[in-house]
Amino acid sequence: MTSKVGVIGLGIMGGAMARNLLADGIEVAGYDPAPAATAEFRDSGGTLASSPFEVGRAADLVLISVASSAALQEVVTGGEGLDGAGRPGLVVIEASTLPLIDKEVARAALAERGAAMIDCPISGTGAQAVARDLVFLASGDADSVAAARPLLERLGRSVKEVGPFGAGSKVKYVANLLVSIYNVATAEAMVLAVRAGLDPAMVFDVLYDSAATSRIFQLRAPFMVEGVYEPATAKISMFVKDLDVIGSFANSLSCPTPLLAAIRPIY
């Protein structure tokens, strides 16, 4: 694996991954416009870059984790964008959950300079990022995925190669559709248990390995049992953004998603 890695977007997910790399003794060049995010990264030993361009100049592997399509566009093709540092051998790992068309635009801009981008969304929460319990949904040309794999294996428990560029995002949409439904189902079930006078800890213990369990139940129900929800593992605004991306994608395929429509107002 390359001796220096770039991370653009140092929020809940990107920041956790960058700190894990630093803990492994890997040099990390990072960029984020938010002062709070950059301060924590710098305090952890990271090298703070002044622009995405500077990150691209410093590293042959660059991971992007941003909150919006506008942010991705600014990072890649903005005034001091990553495309300016594009060159053969640069592999960009786009790990955000965004509309696929926007990732395609970013990939094309980098390809003009000879750089490669893989579409590699993440299945997991901020807490799972800290614990290296992430699943990476890697899609793109085989050589670029192979170049990224050693880095991804450091940061998660599994790297799934799911097909050509864009397949990763499609799998992520399917995954987050299920997660969004499981979140609401878990909360609804635990409220029913409490209203019924049951001990929520007992209910969690009984259901944990029953037919009713799910990975989301195992992750979320303990918060409900304890009544403690801090520190936050994600932002509601980010999750709502993901739901809207999924809904738009499903609509483009004329695919009905009645459960998504039912739970969307709850978020």
Predicted regions and their residues:
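NAD(P)+-binding Rossmann beta1-loop-alpha1 motif at the extreme N-terminus of oxidoreductases
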Residues: 1-64, 126
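Rossmann-fold dinucleotide-binding core
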Residues: 5, 10, 98-176
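Hydrophobic beta-strand scaffold residues
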Residues: 28, 48, 117-118, 159, ...
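Rossmann-fold NAD(P) dinucleotide-binding segment
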Residues: 52-117
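Helical "substrate-binding/catalytic lid" subdomain
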Residues: 167-267
